[in-house]
From Swiss-Prot:
Its main location: membrane. SMART domains: AAA (SM00382). GO terms for molecular function: ABC-type L-arabinose transporter activity; ATP binding; ATP hydrolysis activity. This is L-arabinose transport ATP-binding protein AraG. Part of the binding-protein-dependent transport system for L-arabinose. Probably responsible for energy coupling to the transport system. Its EC number is 7.5.2.12. The gene is araG. Belongs to the ABC transporter superfamily. ATP 1 binds at G40, E41, N42, G43, A44, G45, K46, S47.
Length: 517
């Protein structure tokens, strides 16, 4: 590939961790002023490569060469790479909630004179940077008081304060709603017009096709190919083939639903905000699930989807929760997570790293976490049985790891999600609530998760799926509820459903399905 204005070149980068070679002779070239996408399945090495580039993994811990602006770079830490203008924004945002926007922007790079912070300059400069990223909030606003979309923009403003030449964004839209995602992509295109170079890691191939000039595919720690997207001739299927090493003919596995009787009814469900009890989050929601059925819940960010799920699952979120839960025709009382588990409910959280896993513990202990009583005799865990169950799930769920003694924090996102699912399946539930089950997961791992969901339904379990990706809901669900401002505003069958109808219900403008008042 001819690159007369090559800003970055990474040559033969190899990086190993105990028991695994994460990168194997990877090559990457990025042109000045382009948006370059980096794609690949979870565990392909994308984030590891960017951590090598940015100095998170210092020179000496990897093999190969980094050339930036024609110079060989041997970064000892992230500060050295930032001094040259290479700035990375990680998937997990690093803002301090208790500090203001301005303080976060200049954290570690304070606007000081003679060792004393100049607050007037801090606020003034922060306001200029916020304007550049299109954020109108006051620089004095605490980071905890702005949404995740705005927090992402603050991270970019922070990068701009460091005189960025190469901006690296790792899954920048993974936690954003559609509107915030579009705003961020437009901002990247605006930066490109100004001559800035960006590298974007994303599983959202439609977004990559929209903004990127070139994309490099990684697979199993190796660079497979670099494609030009400027012609518009590279299809998503072509990219997926490069990522997984084969044609993925269908995004969703085939399925013949076998739907049984109603297993769960949620009647007149109300939930108040725990921080503002005078504000209702969920308002008179009614829904039902049948055995063997996959039911979707669609809604924009803030619609109340997660609040609904968590309040049903043992009142684990919300205040003054009221309404009726009926399972198999009988009312059940669920006052705690333990009650929920005892009644056959399971909840896979949208935030696996914070609430779904103990990252510093091994796979075996994470899988057995909700089933210790079941695995115990006289109050003592049967270690042999625990190992057998974990090993069975490792094979059944295709968790890619050399050992169940591996720390869960070392796994890729897709494999972590399989551990969370294994944990809840082992508990033996009749009803599973899956909140964003494939967030931040590549297409290959998504297919495997979809297969697991199909298998659960085939076993007669009811599955409630919450997802921000409408194609996912349309591909998985037998029925879909739409939620808007805490109310169910519509219900559509698989045959009736399409993105347009769902969006109408999600924004309360009606559609052709069954309107719910």
């Amino acid at each position: 590939m001819n690159m007369p204005n090559c800003l970055l070149e990474m040559r033969n980068i190899t990086k190993a961790f105990p028991g695994v070679k994460a990168l194997n002779n990877v090559n990457l070239k990025v042109e000045q002023g382009e948006i370059h996408a980096l794609v690949g399945e979870n565990g392909a090495g994308k984030s590891t490569l960017m951590k090598v580039l940015s100095g998170v993994y210092p020179h000496g811990t990897y093999e190969g060469d980094i050339l930036f602006e024609g110079r060989v770079c041997q970064f000892k830490d992230i500060k050295e790479s930032e001094q040259l203008g290479i700035v990375i924004i990680h998937q997990e945002l690093a803002l301090v909630p208790e500090l203001s926007i301005a303080e976060n922007i200049f954290l570690g790079n304070e606007q000081a004179k003679n060792g004393v912070i100049d607050w007037n300059q801090t606020i003034t400069e922060a306001a200029k940077l916020l304007k550049k990223v299109g954020l109108s909030d006051s620089p004095r606003t605490l980071a905890m008081n702005i949404g995740v979309g705005k927090q992402q923009l603050v991270e970019i403003a922070k990068a701009l304060s460091k005189k960025v030449k190469l901006l690296i964004l790792d899954e920048p839209t993974a936690a954003l709603n559609e509107e915030d995602s579009q705003n961020l992509l437009h901002l990247l295109l605006e930066f490109k017009k100004q001559g800035m170079t960006s590298i974007i890691i994303s599983h959202k191939l439609n977004e990559i096709s929209y903004v990127a000039d070139h994309l490099t595919i990684l697979r199993d720690g190796q660079s497979i190919e670099t494609l030009s997207l400027q012609s518009g001739e590279v299809t998503e299927d072509r990219i997926i083939k490069g990522m997984v090493g084969r044609d993925l003919e269908n995004r969703f596995p085939p399925r013949e639903p076998k739907i049984g009787d109603v297993i769960l009814e949620v009647n007149h469900w109300h939930v108040d905000d725990p921080l503002h009890p005078d504000r209702s989050l969920i308002k008179d929601v009614n829904l039902y699930l049948k055995r063997g059925e996959i039911v979707g819940v669609a809604g924009l960010m803030g619609a109340g989807r997660t609040e609904l799920a968590m309040s049903i699952f043992g009142k684990s979120y919300g205040k003054n929760i009221r309404g009726q839960l009926i399972k198999d025709g009988k009312e059940i009382k669920v006052h705690s997570v333990k009650d929920a588990i005892d009644h056959g409910l399971a909840y896979v959280t949208e935030d696996r790293k914070t609430y779904g896993l103990i990252l510093i513990d091994d796979i075996k202990h994470n899988i057995s976490l909700t089933s210790l009583e079941k695995l115990s005799k006289n109050g003592v865990v049967d270690k042999t049985r625990e190992v057998k169950e974990a090993e069975d799930f490792r094979k059944k769920m295709n968790i890619r790891t050399p050992s169940i003694d591996q720390k869960t924090g070392n796994l890729s996102g897709g494999n972590q999600q399989k551990v969370v699912l294994s944990k809840w399946i082992l508990s033996g539930p009749d009803i599973l609530i899956l909140d964003e089950p494939t967030r931040g997961i590549d297409v290959g791992a998504k297919y495997e998760i979809y297969s697991v969901i199909h298998e659960l339904a085939a076993q007669g379990k009811a599955v409630l799926v919450i997802s921000s990706e409408l194609p996912e809901l349309l591909g998985l669900s037998d029925r879909i509820y739409a939620l808007c401002e805490g109310r169910i505003t519509g219900e559509v069958t698989r045959e009736e459903a399409n993105q347009e109808i769902l969006m109408k219900y999600m924004t309360r403008t009606g559609g052709n399905g069954h309107e719910v008042s």
